[in-house]
Amino acid sequence: LIQAKSIKEVGIVKTDIAQRLSLFIPLTASYFLFNETFSQLKIIGFIVGFSAIFFTLNKKSESKSNNWVYPLLVLLGFGIIDILFKKVAVFKDFSFTTSLFLIFCGAFIVSILFLIGKILIQKEKLESKNILWGLALGILNFGNILFYLKAHKALAENPSTVFAGMNMGVIILGSLAGILLFKEKMTKWNYFGVLLAIISIIIITLSQLK
């Protein structure tokens, strides 16, 4: 909901910047909260990764609004959510699949209440295509988070690898989807950013093998 409000207030570009930069929060938590040690090779991978974020987001924003309250909430929200997912993955009292099911049930209830509010208060009409798209995105999101938690469980001692790998993967797949599905125009710097994201994943993977 906050992300949608941010897009409405300041545009998708500034919101996307805030979401991508939220990677800084879980990486910091990996070091101070989860006591992970970073090798020099992994640090280089992080630097290349943040460079990839900069170049892929090197786009003009159509919004002239400078209200950074919502983008800041997006940055903090996504960063904290990543940390919580890591906690859920290694939580021993419940299996992570049970925790994930409860999380999605809670999110579903909140979404239904929000939808009912929009129908009753704002008199918006509920269209079948919106329901179908919502279900499709929900299923994809569930699968995405499920494998995200599995990765955290498999690499419990190296959460930064999962955090960074996920973020770089989103950059690559998001860029490909934009080009192939939505015919989005990318600059040479955007393509360079995608290349850096691939290089970052390779470097971080190599750091795991050493």
Segments (PLM) and residue ranges:
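C-terminal transmembrane-helix exit sites in multi-pass transporters
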Residues: 24-43, 170-191
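Hydrophobic/small/kink-forming positions within alpha-helical transmembrane segments
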Residues: 1, 23-28, 79, 138, ...
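Juxtamembrane helix-loop-helix junctions in multi-pass membrane proteins
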Residues: 83-106, 126-130, 157-158
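Glycine-/small-residue-enriched transmembrane alpha-helix faces in small-molecule transporters
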Residues: 62-94, 109, 210
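Structural signature of hydrophobic alpha-helical transmembrane segments
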Residues: 34-50, 71-72, 96-109, 157-170
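Membrane-interface interhelical linkers
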Residues: 1-9, 59-70, 104-156, 179, ...
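Structural motif at transmembrane-helix junctions in multi-pass transporters
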Residues: 3-18, 90-98, 148-166
